[in-house]
Design a protein with these regions (language model features):
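Catalytic domains of riboflavin
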Residues: 2-176
Length: 176
């Protein structure tokens, strides 16, 4: 099955390495642990911001966010406006949780996004690879059971192959 293949690849093909950790404070709360991961295949760095403690037996609030230059920084998609600050505010309010920011560095990522905006198409992209990177970061952090922070009802692909479970959902809300 696909879950078996994913499980095999997770156990045999580790594609991320934890390269740096630092305690940080931000406009959205103090005492965040910032962990930098590097994808061993393309050397791209991804970020996990951890608030509070992680217990592998507990349900942990988690937001996995695919960073996009134009949507997150320029604001070309009003549906994604302010999602990173809202996520950090929500996790800070909960006093525990993780925000994972996965960078999309595929060739043509920016131009393909802009073309899909104009043509009103799904940008598709390399979601499977992004899920794999995010899942391996969650595993490295010791997370098994997640309270998914999201306003979307989309179900991520084959999480059981990663031995990850979405046990509940938590709306992102307005970030206040």
């Amino acid at each position: 099955t696909i879950a078996d293949l994913i499980s095999y690849r997770i156990n045999n093909d580790h594609i991320i390495t934890r390269v740096y950790e630092e305690q940080i404070s931000s406009d959205f709360g103090d005492n965040w642990k910032c962990i930098i991961y590097q994808n061993d295949l393309d050397k791209v760095e991804h970020v996990a911001l951890v608030k509070g403690s992680i217990n592998s037996n507990s349900e942990i609030p988690v937001r996995v966010h695919s960073i996009n230059l134009f949507e997150d920084l320029v604001g070309v998609n009003p549906l994604r406006k302010g999602l990173i600050p809202k996520s950090m505010k929500e996790i800070n309010k909960l006093e525990n949780g993780v925000l994972i920011m996965v960078r999309d560095t595929n060739e043509g990522a920016i131009s393909n996004l802009l073309k899909s905006q104009v043509n009103k198409e799904s940008k598709g992209g390399n979601k499977l690879r992004e899920y794999g990177v995010g899942a391996q970061i969650l595993i490295d952090l010791g997370i098994k059971k997640m309270k998914l922070i999201s306003d979307s009802n989309t179900i991520p692909l084959n999480l059981e192959g990663y031995d990850l479970e979405i046990s509940s959902r938590h709306p992102l809300g307005d970030g206040k």
